[in-house]
Amino acid sequence: MKHTQRFRIPDDWKCHTYNHVYFGLVELTIKLSQLLEFQDNKMIEIGSYMGESTHIFGSCGLFTEINCIEPFSGTENFNDKNNHTWEEVWEEYDINTRQFKDIVKLHEDYSYDEKVLSKFNDDEYDFVY
């Protein structure tokens, strides 16, 4: 089994006896549950990679729409170090987001691309990650 950035972190990332990367995001969702005031929250996730964070954001139930911006291409040190291909990354993304197809919208491009940026209005989203 290969390492991932959230669910199965590399040994050299470990600084505790538990997965602090996973728990850090869970703690963030707890804070968000206290801060977000609306029922119909929308978010943008820049760099969804394998969809592990997307899975956690979908599972927490705070968002009715999660917009993922991920090109699934280019240079990624984590891919090189852990022998991942972009095809494998996309397959993991698809697996990790499969339960949230009704709220997850994938924008398969770079976050700085004008055609992606033009899809989002500043005042329409409650959280950007």
Q: Which functions belong to the PLM regions below?
A:
Residues 1-129:
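A short alpha-helical cap/connector motif
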